[in-house]
Amino acid sequence: MQNQLVQPIDHSAHTRVHCDPEWVDLQQQLGFTVLLGTRSMGDLHVVSAPNPGSLNFHVVKFPLCMGMAVQGNHLAVACKTDIRLYYDLIAHPQISSPVYQRSYSPRSIHFTGDLDAHELDFDQHGQPLFVAARYSCVASISPVHSFAPLWQPKFISKLTPEDCCHLNGLCMSNGELKYVSMFAATAQPEGWRNLPFNSGQVWSAADQEAVCTGLVQPHSPRLHNGELYILNSGAGEIGRIDLVSGRYECIAFVGGYGRGLSFVGDYAIFGISKPRHESYVPNFPLHDRLKSLNLPDRCQLLAVNLKTGNVIQAITFEGAAREFFDTVVIPDCRHGVIMALDEAQHPQFVTYEQDDCLLPA
């Protein structure tokens, strides 16, 4: 099926998007919205399907857009030096909108400093947990400090800003930290850079042991329908991990560096990015395979059928956009929006418990 030009979304940055009609139909039928964060540009794309045959793109600017998570009516976004918390105003019974099913307004910003925050999720108490890659730990926000460390791999004896193992991904289960992903199990400063590409591992947080090794720069461990999935990013693959044997099984080669795994129905949703290095990196599995297949670098949102391995090149970004980090699927939301800080700071934008107001279209 031929790709269909949807619309230009940022003329100043010369970025265009193309969308596969199969994806438009899927998003329309299942009635969900996707949040897609572009690390390289700091854009958060709210992709909705309010009308048949086309998509709507709402773009919010961030100073680097990293991990994101939705829990109930709450949204959290990790940025370069802060964690931003939002609330869906339409969840208030007194507030309605003729256009949107979700309207997230910023409610607080926690300043962290540059922790190189990566993936993020909520715990059972509704508090955001995030990977502080620079400090090789999983952390939460603190009322008095930049962050509150909650978990670190057993080989990290002291928290220092040295990005030893490039801890990057986390998986929650029933509100508790279950699994993490890292590039290598090392306590040396930026030690992962000096080890083989296939030194990547997924660890059990509770057991402090690896459940799978031999991965290539893995990201986004996720439990879905009782199975553990992983993006084997440096190999350009999505796969599942057998929790008994620890064996990794490739589901599909996706032709790009994947990050930000979400699910809807039988599909895995994530972004693939173009390489940061303009030149070929010798012996890097993804680069070797792209070169052997004569495939171009791509910046796309993908949907992979977990039953068949079929890959839908859902949305292709051309031009300035090069790198995605995270995705979030918002179910039962045909049209969503996120308010920018300047919108929320408008002096006449006031809500309170007894307020009965109508959001502008």
Segments (PLM) and residue ranges:
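Short loop/turn segments that connect beta-strands within beta-propeller blades
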Residues: 49-51, 89-91, 142-145, 204-207, ...
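Beta-propeller fold detector
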Residues: 55-61, 94-109, 148-155, 212-213, ...
